[in-house]
C-alpha cells in the first residue's frame, strides 16, 4: 500500500487556489500566476446579478422591490400583505446579517445580500414560482437549501401547522406565530445557505488574519490550535501484549471527572464501557454506530466516555484521554485517527497505550508540540515460548485451548470444517467481517470451554480477551490487498502474544505461560525469527486534514468542484511536501466511497466530507444500500430501515438450514444495518425507527451465529473472487442484487 508523504514546502491555506488550465489569469489588468498554490490575490469567480436593478448594485440598504407596474403583475404587487411581510423581513435580515459585521466580512456578506435580492427579483417575475398549489416539506422549511424555491416557500409557508412552526422556531411561549416570523426564518436560512454554499466558495480569503486560513497544512501540529494553547502531559504505557499497560491507564481514567477512552474497535469500547458500568463507574458509550448516554437524575451525562478513536471530540476539554493501541498511528487506512487525536485532544493528560515500536515517533511528535513526555515501560506478566517442533500429526495433534491462525475467511472456515470432521473437537471462529457481537459470542464459548479450539484471522490481534494456551500459525504470509507478503515481526508478535493471556493456571507453578508453534517447520522457523527479532521502530505517522481544514480549502474552489478532486489535489500537493515524520492516509477506500454519492448535487460539500468516512464494506448489496441512503439525504426524506427494498425477509428462522442463503448474505445485511445506525447518529431526522433496526440487527446476529454453529460446507469454497459477493438469491433461486 502506497503512503503519500509530505515535504518541507510551506503551504498556507489562504494560498490554496484552483488551478485553471489557461496560460495567464488577469486580475486588475496585472498578470498573476496560474498556480493556485502561490497566487494569493486571485478571485476565482465573481457572482453576476442579472436581475438586480443597477442602482441597487451599490446601494445596499434597500428593502422594497421595484417593478414596473405596467409590465408586471406579480404577487408582490398584487398582495399587500405579502409585500409588507417581505419588506419587513428583508429589513430585519439586513440588520442582523450586515449591520454589525467585522470589517473583513463586509464585502463577502454584501455579495450574499445582493445574491439574495437578485434571486427574489428573478423569482417574482417567474409565474411558476407563484403557485399556491405547492406544499413545502418540513425539511424544506427547517433548512431551505434550494434558493430557487424561495418565493414558493414564502407564499405557502402557512400550509405548515403552527405546532410545527413552534418547534422549528423553538417558540414554546407564544400561541400565535406570525407570517412575518415565518418569512424571517426562511429568509435567514436562505441567506446563510447562499453565503456558505454559493458565495464563500467563489471568493479568496486574502484578508484573513484570524489564523483560521493561515495554518501551515504541511505541519499537522498547527491544525489543532486549541491543543497548542496548553502544555499537555503525554504519558506512555508501552510494553508487549499481556503486560497490564491498558489496565494502568484505565485506572487513571476512572479517577478523574472528565475523560475519554479511545479504542481501536467498537467492541473494545463496549468492553470498557461494560467494565466501568459493572464497577459502578458512570460512563457513556460513543461509537460510530452506537451512542449511550449515562444520565443522572437531573439529565446530566457522565463525565467519562468510552468510544472509538475516530469519535474523539477533539475540541472538548478533558482531564485524561487514553489512546489505546497507539502504534496504529502508522496504519495506512486508519492511522489518521490516532495521529489527529494525539496532536489535537485538549486534555491535561494524554495516556498512550501500545507497543514500544512507537516510542521514537511519539518523541519526535512531542518535541514538535512542546508537550511534556513521561515513559512507563512494562514487562509481560507471563512467559511466552516458541515450541521447538511443529504440531505433531497436523490437525490431529491439536489440543483443547489451541488457537489456529489463518488469514482469509475461506481458510478459517475450511479449517473449522476439517478440524471438526477429523477430530472430536468443537471449533469457534473469529474473522474480520463477523459482527463484533458474534465475535464476542464465539470468544465466550471458547473461553468457558464449551468449544475446544479457536480458528481465527488476525482479528484476534486486538480487542478480544481470549484464554489461549497455544497459538498455531498456518502460514507466515498475508495478502496485503495487492500481493502475498511475508508478515512483519510486529504482526507476528502481536498475534503470537495472545498465547497465555487470561490464564490463571499453568504448568509453571501458577505463572501464566503461552506457547507458539506451527504446522510446518518452515513457518515455525520464520515465526521464531520474528518473535526473537529486535523491535522494528515506526518511522512515520499517518494523518489526514480535518473536515474543517478540508472545508476551508474547498472555499478556494468554484461551486460544483467534485469532492474527490479536492481530496486528490490535497494528496498530490502533500506528496510533494513536508518531512518524513508524517504520511498521508491512503485515498483509495475514501475515493471509492465518494464515488457512490458524488454525482448527487443536492448533498452539500460538508455532508459529502462526512459521508466519505462512512463504514461501507466492499460488498455489492452494501454499496447499493448506501447509495439509496445517500439519496435519502439528498432528497431530505425521512425513512425507516424497513422502507427500503432490502431482503429482510431472509431474517427468518426457517432460512437458517437453507444453504442457498449464504453466510455472506447475512454479513452483508448486518453491515447494512450497522451502516444505517451510523447514518442515524449523524442524520437523526432522516433515518428513524431505530427500534425496528435494532430488532433486525439482533436477529441477523442470531442467524449468523446459528449458521456458523451448523456449518456443513464452506460458503466461500470455489467462489471466483468478486463473482457474487454480497448478493442474495431471489425466490426462484437466481442471484440478484
Curated annotation (Swiss-Prot):
Record's keyword terms, sorted: ATP-binding, Helicase, Hydrolase, Mitochondrion, Nucleotide-binding, RNA-binding, Transit peptide
Role: Probable ATP-dependent RNA helicase involved in a variety of mitochondrial post-transcriptional processes and in translation. It is a key control element in nuclear-mitochondrial interactions.
Transit peptide: 1-25
Record keyword DNA damage present: no
UniProt domain Helicase C-terminal: residue ranges: 390-546
Coiled-coil positions: none
Species of provenance: Saccharomyces paradoxus (Yeast)
Keyword Nucleus: no
GO cellular component: mitochondrial degradosome
Record: residues binding ATP: 239-246
The EC number(s) this enzyme carries: 3.6.4.13
S-S bridge residues: none
GO molecular function list: ATP binding; ATP hydrolysis activity; RNA binding; RNA helicase activity
Annotated family: Belongs to the helicase family.
SMART domains on file: DEXDc, HELICc
This protein's name: ATP-dependent RNA helicase SUV3, mitochondrial
Subcellular localization: Mitochondrion
Annotated Helicase ATP-binding domain residues: 226-365
EC category name: hydrolase
Gene label: SUV3
Catalytic activity of the protein: ATP + H2O = ADP + phosphate + H(+)
A biological-process GO annotation: mitochondrial RNA 3'-end processing
InterPro entries in UniProt: DEXQc_SUV3, Helicase_ATP-bd, Helicase_C-like, P-loop_NTPase, RNA-DNA_Helicase, SUV3_C, Suv3_DEXQc
Alphabetical list of SUPFAM superfamilies matching this protein: P-loop containing nucleoside triphosphate hydrolases (SSF52540)
Amino acid at each position: 500500500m502506497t503512503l503519500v508523504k509530505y515535504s518541507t514546502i510551506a503551504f498556507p491555506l489562504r494560498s490554496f487556489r484552483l488551478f485553471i488550465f489557461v496560460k495567464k489569469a488577469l486580475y486588475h489588468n496585472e498578470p498573476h500566476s496560474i498556480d493556485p498554490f502561490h497566487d494569493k490575490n486571485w478571485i476565482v469567480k465573481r457572482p453576476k446579478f442579472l436581475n438586480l436593478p443597477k442602482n441597487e448594485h451599490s446601494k445596499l440598504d434597500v428593502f422594497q422591490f421595484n417593478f414596473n407596474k405596467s409590465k408586471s403583475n406579480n404577487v408582490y404587487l398584487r398582495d399587500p400583505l405579502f409585500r409588507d411581510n417581505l419588506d419587513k423581513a428583508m429589513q430585519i435580515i439586513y440588520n442582523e446579517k450586515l449591520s454589525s459585521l467585522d470589517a473583513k466580512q463586509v464585502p463577502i456578506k454584501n455579495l450574499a445580500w445582493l445574491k439574495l435580492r437578485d434571486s427574489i427579483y428573478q423569482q417574482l417575475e417567474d409565474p411558476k414560482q407563484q403557485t399556491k398549489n405547492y406544499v413545502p416539506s418540513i425539511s424544506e422549511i427547517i433548512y431551505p437549501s434550494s434558493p430557487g424555491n424561495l418565493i414558493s416557500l414564502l407564499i405557502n409557508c402557512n400550509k405548515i401547522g403552527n405546532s410545527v412552526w413552534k418547534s422549528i422556531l423553538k417558540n414554546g411561549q407564544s400561541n400565535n406565530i406570525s407570517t412575518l416570523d415565518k418569512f424571517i426564518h426562511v429568509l435567514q436560512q436562505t441567506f446563510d445557505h447562499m453565503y456558505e454554499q454559493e458565495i464563500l466558495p467563489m471568493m479568496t480569503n486574502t484578508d484573513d488574519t484570524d489564523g483560521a486560513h493561515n495554518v501551515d497544512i504541511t505541519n499537522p501540529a498547527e491544525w489543532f490550535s486549541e491543543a497548542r494553547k496548553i502544555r499537555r502531559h503525554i504519558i506512555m504505557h508501552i510494553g508487549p501484549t499481556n503486560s497490564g499497560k491498558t489496565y494502568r491507564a484505565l485506572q487513571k481514567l476512572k479517577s478523574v471527572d472528565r475523560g475519554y477512552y479511545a479504542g481501536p474497535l467498537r467492541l473494545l469500547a463496549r468492553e470498557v464501557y461494560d467494565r466501568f458500568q459493572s464497577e459502578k463507574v458512570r460512563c457513556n458509550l460513543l461509537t460510530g454506530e452506537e451512542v449511550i448516554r449515562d444520565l443522572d437524575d437531573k439529565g446530566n451525562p457522565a463525565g467519562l466516555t468510552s468510544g472509538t478513536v475516530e469519535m474523539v471530540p477533539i475540541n472538548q476539554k478533558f482531564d485524561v484521554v487514553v489512546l489505546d493501541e497507539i502504534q496504529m498511528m502508522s496504519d495506512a487506512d486508519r492511522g489518521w485517527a490516532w495521529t489527529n487525536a494525539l496532536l489535537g485532544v485538549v486534555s491535561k493528560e494524554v495516556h498512550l497505550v501500545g507497543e514500544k515500536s512507537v516510542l521514537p515517533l511519539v518523541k519526535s511528535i512531542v518535541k514538535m508540540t512542546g508537550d511534556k513526555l513521561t515513559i512507563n515501560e512494562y514487562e509481560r506478566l507471563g512467559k511466552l515460548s516458541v515450541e521447538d517442533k511443529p504440531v505433531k500429526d497436523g490437525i490431529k495433534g491439536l489440543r483443547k485451548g489451541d488457537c489456529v491462525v489463518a488469514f482469509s475467511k475461506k481458510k478459517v472456515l475450511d479449517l473449522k470444517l476439517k478440524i471438526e470432521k477429523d477430530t472430536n473437537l468443537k471449533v469457534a471462529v473469529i474473522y474480520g467481517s463477523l459482527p463484533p457481537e458474534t465475535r464476542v459470542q464465539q470468544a465466550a464459548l471458547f473461553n468457558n470451554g464449551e468449544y475446544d479450539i479457536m480458528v481465527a484471522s488476525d482479528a484476534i490481534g486486538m480487542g478480544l480477551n481470549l484464554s489461549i494456551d497455544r497459538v498455531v500459525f498456518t502460514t507466515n504470509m498475508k495478502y496485503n490487498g495487492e500481493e502475498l507478503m511475508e508478515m512483519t515481526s510486529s504482526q507476528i508478535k502481536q498475534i503470537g502474544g495472545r498465547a497465555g493471556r487470561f490464564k490463571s493456571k499453568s504448568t509453571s507453578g501458577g505463572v501464566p505461560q503461552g506457547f507458539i508453534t506451527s504446522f510446518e517447520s518452515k513457518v515455525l522457523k520464520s515465526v521464531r525469527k520474528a518473535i526473537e527479532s529486535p523491535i522494528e521502530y515506526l518511522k512515520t505517522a499517518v494523518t489526514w486534514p480535518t473536515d474543517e481544514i478540508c472545508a476551508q480549502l474547498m472555499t478556494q474552489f468554484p461551486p460544483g468542484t467534485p469532492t474527490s478532486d479536492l481530496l486528490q489535489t490535497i494528496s498530490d500537493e502533500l506528496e510533494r511536501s513536508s518531512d518524513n515524520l508524517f504520511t498521508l492516509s491512503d485515498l483509495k477506500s475514501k475515493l471509492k466511497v465518494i464515488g457512490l454519492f458524488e454525482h448527487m448535487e443536492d448533498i452539500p460539500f460538508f455532508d459529502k466530507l462526512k459521508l466519505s468516512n462512512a463504514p461501507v464494506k466492499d460488498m455489492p448489496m452494501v454499496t447499493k444500500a448506501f447509495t439509496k441512503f445517500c439519496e435519502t439525504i439528498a432528497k431530505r426524506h425521512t425513512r425507516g430501515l424497513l422502507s427500503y427494498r432490502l431482503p429482510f425477509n431472509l431474517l427468518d428462522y426457517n432460512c437458517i438450514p437453507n444453504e442457498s442463503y449464504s453466510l455472506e448474505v447475512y454479513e452483508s445485511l448486518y453491515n447494512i444495518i450497522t451502516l444505517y445506525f451510523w447514518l442515524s447518529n449523524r442524520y437523526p431526522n432522516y433515518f428513524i425507527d431505530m427500534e425496528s433496526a435494532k430488532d433486525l440487527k439482533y436477529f441477523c446476529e442470531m442467524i449468523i451465529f446459528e449458521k456458523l454453529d451448523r456449518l456443513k460446507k464452506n460458503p466461500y469454497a470455489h467462489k471466483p473472487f468478486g463473482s457474487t459477493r454480497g448478493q442474495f438469491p431471489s425466490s426462484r433461486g437466481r442471484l440478484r442484487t
